[in-house]
Amino acid sequence: MSSTWLAPAKINLFLHINNKREDGYHNLQTIFQMLDYYDELKFSITNGGVIKRINGNEDVEQSQDLIVKAAKVLQEYTGTTLGANLSIVKNIPIGGGLGGGSSDAATTLVALNQLWDTKLTQPQLMKLGLNLGADVPVFIFAKSAWAEGIGEILSPIKMPNYYYLVVFINKHTSTKEIFSHYALTMSKPQGKIAKFSELINTHNDCLQAAIALEAEIGVALKHLNTCANHISQVRMSGTGSCVFNEFLTEKDALAAAKKVPKKWMSFVTRAINTSPIHSWAVAKR
């Protein structure tokens, strides 16, 4: 028997880089907004301890695939003798700043913790996930969140369920290159916000570095600025390369999507405040 689970995308409503730490990482502040847009993962439990990806992500070596890595991390930590066959349907753009790989890893940890009956708590899973990537914990946390530290210090925040037009320019940006780029800016830490109405500064400190590395990001932002009825500043998510704007209605977002140049990928989605990750498989066995 197999079970199917969803892995949601996220956007960063702002991203402020505060300083560089001694360990090479950067302290930051951001809001992770969960989206109703998903990769789809399927898990079949096996005996014998073998973990194998049997479908999807063909361009990624199994040993480098985050879903395989996540499964092995959980297996090694818990000592389970069970294995799993893993399949994935990728919808979230790779290298777009939407957290797809991190979300896939998080879903793998949560799903196999249930399916293997390894009984780890959410905090334990989040700690394991942090070893796989700084964004993995928020997807295990499973709520839109105010984040600090390297993104692992999380507080839930309830945001409006706006519609978003997300554009991927079909080019990837390197997080490592952006964080070492001369155009990376820094922002002073701000007080934690408790509600959306307090969100004033939507600046992304990675934006100018990303545009310096990939000028088409700037072109896409200019295009989104021409869209009718968007309600806030157009923005880049994370370290790019996806950009987005915000709408009150799905109708307005879909109308804007029709005008996106065909050379780019785009989709319309809606904000969600809670991810279905901890309950999804119950209805999808």
From Swiss-Prot:
<comment type="pathway">
    <text>Isoprenoid biosynthesis; isopentenyl diphosphate biosynthesis via DXP pathway; isopentenyl diphosphate from 1-deoxy-D-xylulose 5-phosphate: step 3/6.</text>
</comment>
<dbReference type="GO" id="GO:0019288">
    <property type="term" value="P:isopentenyl diphosphate biosynthetic process, methylerythritol 4-phosphate pathway"/>
</dbReference>
<feature type="active site">
    <location>
        <position position="135"/>
    </location>
</feature>
<comment type="similarity">
    <text>Belongs to the GHMP kinase family. IspE subfamily.</text>
</comment>
<keyword id="KW-0067">ATP-binding</keyword>
<dbReference type="InterPro" id="IPR014721">
    <property type="entry name" value="Ribsml_uS5_D2-typ_fold_subgr"/>
</dbReference>
<feature type="binding site">
    <location>
        <begin position="93"/>
        <end position="103"/>
    </location>
    <ligand>
        <name>ATP</name>
    </ligand>
</feature>
<dbReference type="GO" id="GO:0050515">
    <property type="term" value="F:4-(cytidine 5'-diphospho)-2-C-methyl-D-erythritol kinase activity"/>
</dbReference>
<dbReference type="InterPro" id="IPR036554">
    <property type="entry name" value="GHMP_kinase_C_sf"/>
</dbReference>
<keyword id="KW-0808">Transferase</keyword>
<dbReference type="InterPro" id="IPR006204">
    <property type="entry name" value="GHMP_kinase_N_dom"/>
</dbReference>
<dbReference type="InterPro" id="IPR020568">
    <property type="entry name" value="Ribosomal_Su5_D2-typ_SF"/>
</dbReference>
<feature type="active site">
    <location>
        <position position="10"/>
    </location>
</feature>
<dbReference type="Pfam" id="PF00288">
    <property type="entry name" value="GHMP_kinases_N"/>
</dbReference>
<keyword id="KW-0547">Nucleotide-binding</keyword>
<keyword id="KW-0414">Isoprene biosynthesis</keyword>
<comment type="function">
    <text>Catalyzes the phosphorylation of the position 2 hydroxy group of 4-diphosphocytidyl-2C-methyl-D-erythritol.</text>
</comment>
<dbReference type="GO" id="GO:0016114">
    <property type="term" value="P:terpenoid biosynthetic process"/>
</dbReference>
<dbReference type="GO" id="GO:0005524">
    <property type="term" value="F:ATP binding"/>
</dbReference>
<dbReference type="InterPro" id="IPR004424">
    <property type="entry name" value="IspE"/>
</dbReference>
<protein>
    <recommendedName>
        <fullName>4-diphosphocytidyl-2-C-methyl-D-erythritol kinase</fullName>
        <ecNumber>2.7.1.148</ecNumber>
    </recommendedName>
</protein>
<keyword id="KW-0418">Kinase</keyword>
